[in-house]
């Protein structure tokens, strides 16, 4: 058993333990610390009486006040929903164009649309609608299926080549794999991709460009338009073929990527959000996307 020892310099007893010749003084706690400790104990006892504290199986002590953070949260959520109800009802009853003409509804729809976009759309289209490889930019004026409020609303609602009965485009279809399916030879693909490069002011072989135009007219113009203006501008419905004279490419506008695209084809799909989101939410999204900067 350790033996207490009184320190000669301070006159204070030690704890009786020694480590490498070092002894710990057995000083009492400061009075202020001790009193504060007692106050904390007293406060804890008062808290136990007034507030929820002890778990009891599947329940718990409720306290005299019967306070519940969960009930407070539910109350505040219900209050918030009640405040939003009139706006959501109005949005559900109006068209997207009508919503944009109503200053109050527009502000509410933009705020909600931003939140819905970040939660449901940003993973593919980017937080600011800047797009990514294979996912269209929503902040420019190049639209594959139309950039009006009504067009955007319909696209979000029914999707692109989705399993929705009113989807835009035909499910299971897309751009033909001209090389993989044996429709064009490697030389023809080389020529037509040089032709597309020339349309964008990029270096291309003049001899290939002339032959590539013929290949384009015979195989590509039906969807992309006679002047590569895209299906929308060419009035070709239900295709969604992009313009081929632009700066923002869906998959890339360099030679290698163009060859890959023509050889293997492309087939983008977007889900029909009407199966996951209510109509007011979809309209708010349409308003938000339309106002990202490229809406028609």
Swiss-Prot record:
Cofactors demanded by this protein: heme c
Q: Where is the Cytochrome c domain?
A: 108-200, 207-293
Positions bound to heme c 2: 175, 220, 223-224
Residue spans, topological domain Periplasmic: 53-296
Residues the record lists as binding heme c 1: 121, 124-125, 270
Sequence intervals crossing the membrane: 32-52
Q: In which pathway does it act?
A: Energy metabolism; oxidative phosphorylation
Keyword Cytoplasm present in the record's keywords: the answer is no
Please give the InterPro entries that the UniProt record associates with this protein: CcoP_N, CcoP_N_sf, Cyt_c-like_dom, Cyt_c-like_dom_sf, Cyt_C_IC, Cyt_c_oxidase_cbb3_su3, Cytochrome_c_Oxidase_Subunit
Where does the protein end up? Cell inner membrane
Specify the signal sequence span.
none
Chief location of this protein within or outside the cell:
membrane
What's any GO biological process attached to this entry? Answer: proton transmembrane transport
Give the record's cofactor note, including how many are bound.
Binds 2 heme C groups per subunit.
Q: Which UniProt keywords apply?
A: Cell inner membrane, Cell membrane, Electron transport, Heme, Hydrogen ion transport, Ion transport, Iron, Membrane, Metal-binding, Oxidoreductase, Repeat, Respiratory chain, Transmembrane, Transmembrane helix, Transport
What GO MF annotations does this protein's record show? electron transfer activity; heme binding; iron ion binding; oxidoreductase activity
Q: Write down the superkingdom of origin.
A: Bacteria
Subunit and partners: Component of the cbb3-type cytochrome c oxidase at least composed of CcoN, CcoO, CcoQ and CcoP.
The UniProt family comment states: Belongs to the CcoP / FixP family.
The record's PANTHER family line, in alphabetical order, gives:
CBB3-TYPE CYTOCHROME C OXIDASE SUBUNIT FIXP
Tell me, in a sentence or two, what this protein's role is. C-type cytochrome. Part of the cbb3-type cytochrome c oxidase complex. CcoP subunit is required for transferring electrons from donor cytochrome c via its heme groups to CcoO subunit. From there, electrons are shuttled to the catalytic binuclear center of CcoN subunit where oxygen reduction takes place. The complex also functions as a proton pump.
Recorded protein name is Cbb3-type cytochrome c oxidase subunit CcoP
Supply the source organism for this entry. Azospirillum sp. (strain B510)
């Amino acid at each position: 058993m350790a033996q207490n020892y009184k320190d000669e310099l301070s006159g204070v007893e030690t704890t009786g333990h020694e480590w490498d010749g070092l002894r710990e003084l057995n000083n009492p706690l400061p009075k202020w610390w001790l009193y504060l400790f007692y106050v904390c104990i007293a406060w804890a006892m008062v808290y136990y009486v007034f507030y929820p504290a002890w778990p009891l199986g599947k329940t718990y002590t409720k306290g005299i006040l019967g306070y519940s953070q969960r009930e407070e949260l539910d109350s505040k959520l219900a209050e918030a929903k009640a405040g939003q109800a009139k706006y959501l009802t109005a949005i559900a009853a109006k068209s997207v164009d009508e919503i944009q003409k109503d200053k109050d509804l527009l502000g509410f729809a933009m705020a909600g649309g931003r939140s819905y976009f970040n939660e449901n759309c940003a993973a593919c289209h980017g937080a600011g609608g800047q797009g990514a490889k294979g996912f269209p930019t929503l902040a420019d004026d190049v639209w594959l299926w139309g950039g009006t409020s009504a067009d955007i609303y319909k696209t979000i609602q029914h999707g692109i080549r989705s399993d929705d009965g009113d989807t835009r485009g035909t499910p299971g279809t897309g751009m033909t794999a001209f090389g993989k399916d044996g429709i064009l030879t490697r030389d023809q693909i080389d020529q037509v991709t040089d032709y597309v490069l020339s349309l964008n002011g990029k270096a291309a072989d003049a001899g290939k460009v002339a032959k590539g135009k013929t290949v384009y007219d015979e195989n590509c113009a039906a969807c992309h338009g006679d002047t590569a203006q895209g299906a929308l501008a060419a009035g070709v419905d239900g295709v969604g073929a992009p313009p081929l004279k632009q700066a923002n490419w869906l998959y890339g506008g360099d030679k290698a990527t163009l060859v890959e695209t023509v050889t293997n084809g492309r087939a983008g799909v977007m889900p029909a959000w009407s199966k996951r989101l209510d109509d007011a939410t979809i309209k708010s999204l349409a308003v938000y996307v339309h106002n990202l900067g490229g809406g028609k």
